[in-house]
Amino acid sequence: FQAEDGIRDLVRSRGLGDVYKRQIVNSFNSTKILKFVIRYLSIINHRTLITLLLSLIVPFCAYNFEIIYNIDLTLISIAIIFPLVFAIRGAFKRREKALEFLSLHRGAIKTISYFFMNSSKLPDDAKNEIKEILNDLSDSFLNHLSQSNCNTDKIDKKTELIYKFIEKHNEELSGGVKQKIFRFIRDVHVSQENLIAIHTHRTPISLKAYCLIFIYMFPVIYTPTIINKIGLENPVGLTYFVIILSEFILISLYNIQDQMEYPFDKDGLDDIKLDYFKNAYKKV
């Protein structure tokens, strides 16, 4: 809304006609709507296409070959729903933990910076140096989380620079200040190690594979039972609708879980906005 008000102020200040004003504002609104739609369609991918094809092919074969039976679907429902719900809950907890440790990481780095800035014996050049070290560590670590690389050697070396800086300016920092700084360096290490663990280790692959296989198998088992319940005398389109809708719901939940499981890659709707956790310090 603030951006829209800015557009309106801009066209008003430049003396454009009412028609041009409306065109610019409408174009801006259309762009917002388009981006909104694209974001919410991000859960549709190749797996959605596979399930759609299965939902069309299986009923076609069932009707043509008259494959109809009536079985209890409780077991197959448990086989899909239980691992799917378990995986979604696990992905949600991972995301919440990631937010918790990102906040801890940012807070610890900012607090460390405050201790250095309040050290009266520390020269301005040294204060600027430690600011650059902390900025570089924050940016590098968050960039590392957004990538698939699991090697943390560079991050470890950048974190170690804080300790080397303390050693270098040992006489200019009081013992009490150093103890407090080390306390928050520990928080930096704890948050980094936990975030690296979240970044590296995912939901058990075997569980996800098991869940996906049964989602693909679901139309094969489910379709003849639906035909039996609906009846051959009822419209064929009703069977297709039920199968397609059921498969779309299941695969969409699976895709949401898959996106939520990678909270740092900026690919899903619920991905964490890492830029909000960066530290930007001005030089003294």
Task: List where the protein language model places each region.
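Soluble C-terminal extramembrane regulatory/interaction domains of multi-pass membrane proteins
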Residues: 182-185, 233, 243, 259
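Membrane-interface, cytosolic juxtamembrane amphipathic helix immediately N-terminal to a transmembrane helix
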Residues: 26-46, 176, 183-213, 265
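Hydrophobic alpha-helical bundle architecture
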Residues: 200-205, 225-233
